């Protein structure tokens, strides 16, 4: 059975050096175990692993776990730091490396472009350049340096993505307020803050009518949609009592939840089963979060294997083949 991993990450050594030298609030610190980790202030953001940098390691891991294709993306903190010149440079460094990796392994790798979202003209230029060298989608964090993705400032970028009908992987990062809420303790930013970040971003998109504005947008909500599936009843009740004068959606909240896509990274069989019951199996794709410490390749295989055969095939590859036109 073909397997396509749509949620897997990469860095380059040069990207980390740019971050180290020009990262602003972001930087690298030594952990108690002696390894380097990316922090924002005192809040852990990401822990680079050897597999983030080495595509030979990646291909061996894919071979060992029977993954046929990976669609790779830059992860947190992406390129929303350092000013315009630095943001563009970091995006191009990451995107060029992924394009080169795809050239080296054309049957095994595809990639999401990262864009300097804080500078829309530059972001659109990089989007055009990235698509020309092989990008099959766009990676965006759930907030751009604290700014909502529905901010009209980003409209030119969304219009171009929508025009191109590109899949967008919406991935969480440290949410606004993470420092005030002391989410650095016990890695609460990852465990809870990331889920809040995704949930708030997509909920705002739903209630502002964002998906009506961009009807061809193929959005993928990371980590099984965070808490979105669990809140479906609350969304419906909120819509029921909303004043008609303030309502911006053209459909019901559940309709939008069934319009967007999700990966299967839930770490729990019952959570995946519930996600499918809410949004439908045709909206869910295979993901592992490799090579982060919290990757769950075995869980992704086990949880999809437990589903009906047709559902398993759709999630492991069929849906991704349709969404990414592979």
Region roles according to the model:
Residues 4-6, 70-72, 110-113, 138-140, ...:
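Hydrophobic faces of well-ordered beta-strands that scaffold small-molecule active sites
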Residues 11-13, 78-80, 118-119, 146, ...:
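Active-site environment of divalent metal-dependent phosphoester hydrolases
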Residues 1-6, 11-69, 96-104, 125-129, ...:
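Mid-to-C-terminal alpha-helical segments outside catalytic/metal-binding sites
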Residues 12-52, 176-196, 235-257:
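Active-site gating loops and adjacent loop-to-helix segments of metal-dependent hydrolytic enzymes
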Residues 206-255:
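Aromatic-lined glycan-binding groove of carbohydrate-active enzymes
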Residues 68-202:
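Active-site gating/metal-coordination segments in enzymes
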Residues 97-104, 129, 133, 156, ...:
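Alpha-helical structural signal in soluble globular domains
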Residues 140, 187-199, 213, 219-220, ...:
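Active-site core of metal-dependent hydrolases
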